[in-house]
């Protein structure tokens, strides 16, 4: 609440209007979804999709994308954009960080041509790609020219799955996986500080993960992730913070 109040005081954001906040977590169908629409000007709005939160339900849903073309949050993302397009007839931009960018791209690709004709840029910040089958659809092909993709130099999440969208490499002041936080990305004169190449570590991780998912069937991937997360749930872990805290305690006790 304090941050919201401070944003309201800033000249840059005082004229913005917020609409349609939606947030849902459903463990029964493995879904974590959140979105918000912001009016930038009378004729332009931006639909912003939230990335994965701290819940393991959200993280499990992320890894479902390695074997399933469509996850529960994709359906919500598509319906949310459809609804916003019905109540607003101007230009609609889309954006999201991490899974949020993935949802933005999927939602845009899944729209009817009339809605797609009103879409502006789609900003994906260190966001996973999509299942390879989605890349073959007419809807995806139609929105690829609109998409802009940004990843840090030691990217991991932003290289997962498949994408045909060129990326801009942003310099981060953090280490390894901590670069996933956009708060660590460097800005100079109002622009991202960019780099020419990904780190060798990022390239190796990307090659290793893609090789593994290509060699394993979708059925085997589904079984692996189901067993992996069920293990975490069984020992009482509910959030990613639990994994880095309690889980390491269990490992130390075991050994």
Q: Where are each of the predicted segments found?
A:
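Alpha/beta hydrolase fold serine-hydrolase catalytic domain that processes acyl esters and thioesters
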Residues: 1-45, 49-91, 112-255
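Gly/Ala-rich beta-loop-alpha elbow adjacent to hydrolase catalytic centers
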Residues: 95-100, 104
């Amino acid at each position: 609440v304090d941050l919201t109040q401070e944003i309201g005081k800033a000249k840059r954001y005082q004229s913005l209007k917020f609409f349609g906040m939606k947030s849902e977590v459903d463990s029964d169908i493995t879904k974590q979804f959140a979105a918000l629409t912001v009016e930038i000007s009378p004729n332009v709005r931006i639909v912003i999709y939230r990335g994965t939160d701290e819940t393991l339900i959200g993280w499990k849903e992320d890894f479902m994308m390695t074997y399933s073309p469509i996850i529960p949050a994709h359906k919500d993302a598509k319906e949310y954009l459809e609804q916003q397009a019905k109540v607003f007839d101007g230009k609609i931009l889309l954006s999201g960080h991490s899974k949020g960018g993935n949802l933005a791209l999927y939602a845009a690709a899944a729209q009817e041509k009339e809605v797609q004709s009103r879409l502006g840029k789609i900003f994906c910040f260190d966001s996973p790609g999509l299942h390879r089958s989605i890349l073959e659809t007419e809807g995806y092909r139609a929105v690829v020219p609109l998409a802009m993709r940004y990843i840090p130099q030691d990217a991991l999440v932003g290289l997962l799955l498949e994408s045909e969208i060129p990326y801009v490499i942003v310099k981060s002041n953090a280490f390894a996986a901590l670069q996933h936080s956009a708060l660590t990305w460097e800005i100079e004169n109002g622009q991202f500080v960019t780099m020419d190449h990904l780190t060798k570590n990022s390239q190796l991780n990307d090659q290793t993960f893609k090789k593994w998912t290509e060699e394993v069937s979708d059925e085997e991937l589904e079984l692996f992730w189901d067993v992996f997360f069920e293990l975490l749930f069984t020992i009482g872990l509910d959030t990613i913070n639990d994994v880095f805290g309690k889980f390491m305690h269990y490992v130390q006790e075991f050994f």
